[in-house]
């Protein structure tokens, strides 16, 4: 049933939309429109919904489903935008994948391990059936419209979608870690200020 719906609905629609957008005089609009589509299409992934809920339950709400969804949406939007740049310019995918994975692996040494594990799971989940059945035909249709090479320029969208959540989710973890450290460093100052406020006016403090 899913394959029938994908072949009849998603794939032709994605291909047609890509050709329409690529056939416009302002071809650069492919980039922001592709990013917008990527931002919302990941919300339709059933596996993404399940992952977000599981992460929220396991972390007792420390990482909310909404925060996870926003990080994944931002990652997929970025990946689709970069894919449209490839379609328009013909840049090799290696110029994106190699630096991207190197950066993702590099920050994994400073990010809490929980976020690193979640990020790698999120990368696999985000590149699910909706990506393969809609975003890939979208890139193929756009590539046909701009006269590019489908084999070298259109393919690789799924790989990009699998990579960017590794970066966005880990960056989310890095921000959370920095906020935690800042809060801990400020706590002793707050405790001292509260203690001084409770002392009577004639109290003598020995140094």
Description of each model-found segment:
Residues 25, 145-163:
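Structural signal for the N-terminal portions of transmembrane helices
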Residues 2-16, 42-47:
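Transmembrane alpha-helix boundary signature
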Residues 2-9, 81-82, 132-149:
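Hydrophobic alpha-helical transmembrane segments in multi-pass integral membrane proteins
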Residues 155, 159-184:
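Membrane-helix cytosolic exit motif
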Residues 28-108:
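Helix-loop-helix junctions within the multi-pass membrane cores of secondary transporters/permeases
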């Amino acid at each position: 049933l899913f394959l029938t719906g994908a072949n009849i609905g998603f794939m032709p629609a994605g291909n047609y939309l890509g050709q329409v957008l690529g056939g416009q005089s302002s071809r650069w609009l492919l980039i922001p429109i592709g990013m917008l589509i990527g931002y919302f299409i990941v919300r339709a992934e059933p596996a993404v919904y399940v992952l977000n809920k599981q992460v929220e339950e396991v972390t007792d709400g420390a990482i909310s489903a909404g925060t996870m969804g926003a990080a994944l949406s931002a990652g997929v939007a970025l990946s689709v935008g970069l894919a449209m740049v490839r379609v328009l310019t013909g840049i090799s995918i290696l110029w994106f994948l190699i630096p991207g994975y190197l950066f993702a692996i590099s920050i994994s040494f400073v990010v809490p391990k929980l976020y690193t594990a979640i990020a790698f799971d999120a990368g696999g989940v985000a590149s699910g059936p909706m990506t393969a059945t809609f975003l890939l035909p979208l890139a193929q249709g756009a590539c046909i419209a701009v006269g590019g090479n489908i084999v070298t320029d259109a393919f690789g969208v799924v790989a990009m979608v699998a990579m960017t959540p590794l970066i966005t989710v880990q960056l989310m973890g890095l921000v959370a870690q920095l906020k935690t450290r800042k809060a801990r460093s400020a706590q002793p100052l707050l405790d001292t200020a509260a203690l001084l406020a409770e002392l009577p006016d004639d109290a003598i403090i020995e140094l």
